A protein has these predicted regions:
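ATP-dependent carboxylate activation and anion-phosphoryl transfer catalytic cores
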Residues: 117-120, 243-354
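Hydrophobic beta-strand scaffold residues
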Residues: 46, 94-95, 123, 144, ...
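Short acidic/His/Gly/Ser-rich catalytic and metal-binding motifs that mark active-site loops
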Residues: 12-16, 152-154, 220, 291-292
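Phosphate-binding site of ATP-dependent enzymes
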Residues: 165-245, 249-252, 273-280
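ATP-binding N-terminal substructure of ATP-dependent carboxylate-amine bond-forming enzymes
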Residues: 1-96, 101, 105-107, 130-136, ...
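Active-site nucleotide/adenylate-binding loops and adjacent lid/helix of ATP-dependent enzymes
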Residues: 1-7, 60-62, 104-185, 191-193, ...
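Short glycine-enriched, charge-decorated loop/helix-capping segments at active-site entrances
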Residues: 19-24, 158-162, 298-300
Length: 354
């Protein structure tokens, strides 16, 4: 199969004068090379397309592909992740990962939480601060947690994100409003363990790949999976693929949220426990990072015994099945689905019971 790759390369934007933080969600050359190598190992030919601007030019020249593996994040607005999928749909080109509606919904964390909450799933109580006047209207008990409503890679999350009083809330919200030019999500701070849940598939076919606990080491910014902690994860963060009662509860909430939000093919759901040990939905990442070494989903898969190529094959197989296309992956299906709370294992490898 001839597969096009759409992406935003971080170094291109840095050369244009954007900051390290502004480009934090964009991809490295290693990510693109890793995708090429994985898809090549699965028997496919790949074509580097690039950003939406490159895609527009190539479509206008009449270029087409059997499938597009889209990891483009976009640059501006709540619909930035939806731009490439919308263009591909206009040209009737199949692509990997979620559709424009889901990507826009998931990027706006407040909207996603409303959908999850309205479907009966637990998520921390929250308020949206769109203007400085909204700060006084926040009536939630402290401590609270503040973050930009539509950023990824923990952008905008730091030491001041956890607030203990009204003065700190005002200070943090004003800083985030000015710095990120978007609303601030203010939610009840949950003091318990934090997990990220890997999911493969769509709808009824979706299943949990594994549950990865995120633990902060000595020297890390305390109590939060911040931008600083994530950027220096090698020394500040410990990731542990774990199984137990809490992990099973986290997996169930995550899988239900994934299905309710309409996410497709593969990604992550972040879960945190409250002071009673109950699992709550924090946010979903339907366009998860795929760096072959350091991305959370890849780390999770590796600890589950799956290499990068197998993970990419699983995601691609899910997209092929969803599109009703004949599977052209030479390696065939790369996984065996398992029940919630269990880890998907490659063929020939026994699954472990939590």
């Amino acid at each position: 199969m001839r597969i096009g790759l759409t992406y935003d390369l971080r170094e291109d934007y840095l050369q244009r004068g954007f900051s390290e933080e502004e480009t934090a969600e964009f991809d490295s050359p290693e990510t693109i090379t890793g995708l090429e190598e994985a898809l090549g190992a699965l028997g496919h030919d790949t074509v580097r397309i690039g950003s939406i601007h490159d895609l527009t030019k190539r479509l206008s020249r009449g270029e087409r592909w059997d499938m597009v593996f889209n990891i483009a994040e976009g640059l501006r607005g709540f619909a930035r992740e939806a731009q490439v999928p919308a263009l591909l749909e206009a040209f009737d080109i199949p692509y990997v990962f979620s559709d424009p509606l889901v990507l826009s919904l998931a990027l706006h964390k407040g909207m996603a939480k409303r959908v999850v909450r309205d479907n009966g799933l637990p998520t921390p109580d929250f308020a949206l601060v769109e203007t400085p006047d909204d700060i006084a209207r926040v009536k939630l008990p402290y401590p609270l947690f503040c973050k930009p409503v539509a950023e990824g890679t923990s952008k905008g999350i730091g030491k001041s994100s956890k607030v203990e009083n009204t003065a700190a809330l005002k200070r943090t919200c004003l800083e985030l409003l000015a710095r990120h030019n978007q609303p601030v999500l203010v939610e009840t701070y949950l003091p318990g363990r934090e997990f990220t849940v890997g999911i493969i598939g769509t709808g009824a076919d979706a299943h949990v790949l594994g549950v990865l606990e995120v633990s902060l080491n000595q020297g890390a910014e305390s109590g939060i999976y911040s931008y600083h902690n994530k950027e220096h994860y090698e020394s500040l963060v410990t990731y542990t693929l774990s199984r137990g009662k809490a992990e099973t509860a986290a997996a169930k909430v995550a899988l239900k949220a994934w299905r309710v939000l309409g996410c497709r093919d593969g990604g992550r759901v972040d879960i945190r426990l409250d002071d009673h040990g109950h699992a709550h939905f924090l946010e979903v990442n339907p366009l998860a990072g795929l760096h072959p070494i350091r991305s959370d989903l890849v780390i999770l898969a590796r600890q589950a015994g799956l290499n990068h190529t197998t993970l990419i094959g699983m995601i691609l197989d899910a997209a092929i099945k969803r599109h009703g296309m004949q599977s052209l992956t030479t390696a065939g299906p790369a996984y065996l689905p398992r029940e919630v709370g269990q880890t998907a294992q490659p063929r020939g490898q026994e699954a472990l019971t939590p």
